Regions:
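Conserved "repeat-terminator" motif of extracellular CCP/Sushi domains
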Residues: 4, 33-50
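Surface-exposed interfaces of beta-sheet-rich extracellular modules
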Residues: 6-33
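Post-HExxH zinc-binding segment in Zn-dependent metallohydrolases
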Residues: 213-290, 295-298
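N-terminal low-complexity, Pro/Thr/Ser-rich intrinsically disordered segments
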Residues: 50-78
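Pan-zinc metallopeptidase signature
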Residues: 272-348
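Low-complexity, Pro/Thr/Ser/Gly/Ala-rich linker/spacer regions in secreted
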Residues: 46-59, 342-348
Length: 348
């Protein structure tokens, strides 16, 4: 209780980890101000959690999805929602151990203290993956994980009738930005640890490249646009680099129909090109069977020097947009995680 006309100083003092944002009942923008009391008034301070950049690096745990919509578990890692198929469609559930291994790979690809990482650009990449900013804002990136291949499920959860076969699946997936699958025990795999590494790195890169790297470095949203169905991409940096690789005999497109002018095939070509370019710049060809993926990717482009000589636009593209935001995972650590016959520990 104060006498009329009394001057009172009001101060909002936040707890650790919080910051003052505004007052209810007063328009003053400062966290401390003085007023003259002439009538009964109510003033309330509002606070919010301070969002530090480190908060964007998250290593969540597996939690159940209820009700089950083909996927029965999820885990969020650095803004990416991993979705694991349950025991459904005649298949056993993807084991938790493989979900953790997938999460650890994403973690290894986004090390904040790795050499050459631009911290601001990497944070922008994670914000883009979360759907907080960027070209798919409102739709967080997801990574689907299932067993073997689509035809290993009866009915196939990837075909046009999937919503009839698995009610609610389409609406569930439509709320996310999704690209490729990560397969546990891929039907094409020989069961070796190196096969697993190649499988999982390829498909996690597809997700990060499309939904995160495009959004990390300034200018990347335009430069790395592969959405050919939505707009003209013929003058983007990514398309020009891919076309140069094709023209120079580095990137063979027979597996994608063989027609460089087929716009419908461009998104897949560009997705695969980014993965192949990255493997070459990392010198990861040893994970390919026999150390080669020729003719799809020429043996002369399995090293940075080879790419610089034979696909200079790709070399520049990688160093400008990929290198500042994606960390190169250790081959030794990957081989500890992925050993032959499904052995190895995630370390997550």
């Amino acid at each position: 209780t104060y006498d009329e006309g009394t001057e009172v100083t009001v101060t909002a003092t936040p707890d650790d980890g919080y910051e003052f944002i505004e007052w209810d009942g007063n328009d003053n923008q400062s966290n401390s101000f003085t007023i003259s009391v002439n009538s009964n008034i109510t003033i309330q301070a509002n606070f919010q959690i301070i969002q530090s950049n480190q908060n964007y690096y998250s290593s969540g745990d597996i939690i159940p999805i209820e009700p089950v919509v083909f996927y029965d578990r999820e885990l969020t890692i650095n803004g990416i929602k991993l979705l694991a198929a349950g025991s459904i469609g005649g298949q056993e559930a993807v084991p938790d151990s493989w979900v953790y291994k997938t999460a650890q790979v994403f973690k290894l690809l986004m090390e904040s203290d790795a050499e050459g990482i631009d911290s601001d650009a990497q944070i922008n990449m994670i914000k883009t993956l979360k759907g907080e900013i960027g070209w798919h804002q409102g739709y967080p990136a997801g990574q689907r994980i299932a067993r073997g291949g689509g035809n290993e499920y009866s009915p196939n959860f990837l075909d046009d009738n999937r919503n009839q076969s698995y009610p609610g699946l389409e609406a569930f997936e439509d709320a996310l930005a999704l690209d490729d699958m990560v397969w546990y025990k891929n039907i094409d795999s020989q069961g070796t640890g190196d096969d697993d590494i190649n499988e999982i790195i390829e498909h996690t890169l597809h997700t990060i490249h499309r939904f995160g790297v495009r959004g990390g470095v300034e200018g990347s949203t335009e430069a790395l646009n592969i959405e050919a169905e939505e707009e003209d991409i013929t003058n983007t940096d990514i398309f020009l680099a891919m076309k140069e690789a094709y023209t120079n005999g580095v990137f063979d497109i027979e597996g994608y129909g063989g027609d460089i002018n087929n716009r419908d095939a461009w998104p897949v070509m560009l997705k695969e090109y980014q993965y192949l370019l990255t493997f070459g710049m990392w010198e990861f060809s040893e994970f390919w069977e026999g150390g080669s993926l020729s003719p799809e990717w020429n043996d002369n482009a399995r090293t940075p020097s080879g790419i610089q000589a034979n696909n200079p636009l790709g070399y520049e593209l990688y160093n400008t947009y990929f290198k500042p935001v994606i960390s190169i995972p250790s081959k030794e650590i990957l081989r500890e995680i992925f050993k032959d016959d499904d052995q190895g520990e995630s370390g997550y």
